[in-house]
Amino acid sequence: EVQKTTLPAGVVRIKANAEGFDPDYYCNLEAQTGGKAFLRCWHITEDYFLLLMYDRSLTETGFTANQLAIYQGETGKLTYVTGLPSADLISGFGNTPYVENGYAYMAVTTTEGYPSIYKIDPVGAVATKGVSIEATQISGVGKLQPQN
């Protein structure tokens, strides 16, 4: 049995300076996705989060995490990211996005062509293709800073 929780996949929060979960905040993500759950979540900026989503319910067989979505905490809205390759072509994502100036940069590997870095705008939930790398896969992306 895959599902081991009593609630559907969702979001809870701990307010600043609080010691526990906010009992008045729970957002059911499966209600917004037709029963799909998420595998990972990363903070981007303010109350925007990038989620790695499964393509189908965990109660079905053959599920895979091949979609990205943006969750905004204030509104509780989940929006799938547009501008990425078709989910059936995506074979993987980088382990962790690089975040800078309010944008997330995610490595995307497909079954066609070379992997690429996509810049994701969380406000519009839009990805823009950047550089492609002549490789089979990109596990991560980052930025080197000079030491002072």
Task: Give the ranges of each region predicted by the language model.
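Short, solvent-exposed coil/turn segments at beta-strand boundaries
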Residues: 15-18, 42-49, 93-104, 123-125, ...
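Short beta-strand elements that form the blades of beta-propeller/WD-repeat-like
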Residues: 1-4, 47-61, 101-111, 148
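Beta-propeller fold detector
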Residues: 21-32, 77-86, 128-134
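Acidic, serine/threonine- and glycine-rich low-complexity intrinsically disordered segments
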Residues: 1-49, 53-56
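Repeated scaffold domains used in trafficking and secretory/extracellular systems
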Residues: 31-44, 88-97, 133-147
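C-terminal hydrophobic structural anchor segments
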Residues: 68-110
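Acidic/polar, low-complexity intrinsically disordered N-terminal segments immediately downstream
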Residues: 109, 114-116, 120-123, 127-134, ...
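Beta-propeller blade signature
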Residues: 6-19, 64-76, 117-124
